[in-house]
Amino acid sequence: SHATKTATITPPVGEPWEESYDIIVVTAGAVTRTFPIPGVADQAIGMKNIEEAIAVRDRMLTNFEKASTLPAGPLRDRLLTFVVVGGGFAGVETYGEMRSFASSLIAQYPTLTFDDVHFHLIEAMGRIMPEVSLKTSLWVIKNLEQRGAPVHLDTQLTSAVDGKIELSTGESFESDLIVWTAGVMASPVLSNTD
């Protein structure tokens, strides 16, 4: 209780006990915040830990392998279309690294070209990386676009059901890899605390 400055500790095994405190800090971590966008919870991979980064890498490797055996068409396009949602530092860094990784993979598959691979960075605000100057943000956008990685500003993901991407601009396409970096929230462990 805050009034008595005591906390009840309830371990997984054993009896609970009271602990007094002057200041209490609860660091239960954070989880990916997906917003109520249809398909995101089922389709998107977060980017908060090494396991998620490995899942993104593995999906890219698998998609390039599969796509290299297919003729040009909708299925190959879906496998080679990569979406990152969120234009903060995590999203922009992930996006740039994915573009670089794709370029290195193209060299291993003679049936695929740079133009076969499609990237989309989706950002709801009118700029990326709000932590830096506008000049730096614009430079990063220009650099990404020169590398074949366009940025969609003032654009929201409205649906990702079954990998069918729908944007607030009316644009739609299919993707087999959606990376979600658009936010975090406190761990649900804290949902019943004051």
Please describe what each predicted stretch is:
Residues 1-4, 99-194:
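A Rossmann-like FAD-binding core segment of flavoenzymes
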Residues 52, 90, 156:
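Residue-level recognition of oxygen-bearing side chains
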Residues 29-32, 95, 184-186:
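Short glycine-rich anion-binding loops that position phosphate/pyrophosphate groups of nucleotides
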Residues 54, 92, 130:
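Loop/helix-junction capping segments adjacent to catalytic residues or to phosphate/diphosphate-binding pockets
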Residues 1-81, 179:
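FAD-binding core/adjacent interface of flavoenzyme oxidoreductases
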Residues 30, 88, 125:
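Short, flexible active-site-adjacent loop segments at beta-strand->alpha-helix junctions, enriched
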Residues 58-114:
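Rossmann-like NAD(P)H-binding beta-loop-alpha module
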Residues 33-34, 91, 128, 188:
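Flexible, glycine-rich phosphate/dinucleotide-binding loops
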